[in-house]
Amino acid sequence: MSLRDLKEENRIVIWPSYFFSPTRSKGRRLARIPYKIKTEELVSTLRELGLDPIVIENKKYPRDRKINFLIAVKKVKSKNYTLKIIHNALMGTRQTNPNKSN
């Protein structure tokens, strides 16, 4: 599956660096999350939001070559709006679940 195919399916690309990177210059697009999130936690949150995530391996993020996968999700309004929905869900998930350690 190519990135062009994703546009035809009305999907956007979410790189893990948007959430995992320590600085904005390295790719983080949102406010810092005060805890480390795992890829599985990110994918499960996307499923809960109904964004139908597809993990695509062997795709490298241009700013950080260590990241070798991307996540394609259904587009909701704009990319920035979709990222904010995901960020708010990640922040709310950790706050409402006290069993997970910070």
From Swiss-Prot:
Part of the signal recognition particle protein translocation system, which is composed of SRP and FtsY. Archaeal SRP consists of a 7S RNA molecule of 300 nucleotides and two protein subunits: SRP54 and SRP19. Gene3D superfamilies: Signal recognition particle, SRP19-like subunit (3.30.56.30). GO terms for molecular function: 7S RNA binding. Keywords: Cytoplasm, Ribonucleoprotein, RNA-binding, Signal recognition particle. One of its GO terms (biological process) is SRP-dependent cotranslational protein targeting to membrane. Belongs to the SRP19 family. It comes from Saccharolobus solfataricus (strain ATCC 35092 / DSM 1617 / JCM 11322 / P2) (Sulfolobus solfataricus). It is found in: Cytoplasm. Involved in targeting and insertion of nascent membrane proteins into the cytoplasmic membrane. Binds directly to 7S RNA and mediates binding of the 54 kDa subunit of the SRP. One of its GO terms (cellular component) is signal recognition particle. This is Signal recognition particle 19 kDa protein.
